[in-house]
Amino acid sequence: MRLLDEELFDLLNGELDLERAREIQRAPKDLDRRQRLLAIAQQKLGWSEPIMLPLQENLFVVRTDAGKKVRCRCGHYFDDYRRNWKESALVYERDPQDGELYSSTNAPTKEWMILREFYCPSCATLLDVENVPQGYPFIFNFLPYFDDEPE
């Protein structure tokens, strides 16, 4: 299904009505959709470095002169995409029993579980949340593979 650029833009911004979004999800994808989505994101953000891959709503892998880096929507650079960007983020470890997220009867015990919130050090955008056992290392969500990388 060939989409108009306006529809792709609205889809990226969450402004497309739900029924149309579902229709698009169910339909076969046009072969150049990924490139078109990257072009729209590139235009929207206005960066000179090309976007290689959106990691999530506010994080992207971009190609720089120093290699591929993770970059926040605000422009902040994290480290090389092969390192866990969370190690360079601001981390807030929330007490799950503070009552803000869970009622006292549903909250996990803080001796067992921890809620980690990861924020951009430049713009303070919430980038990710993990609910993990105490002492568990940061989760590396995924490591993208790029064809031009040596093995």
Model-derived segments and their meaning:
Residues 1-115, 119-151:
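N-terminal pre-domain and mature-chain start segments
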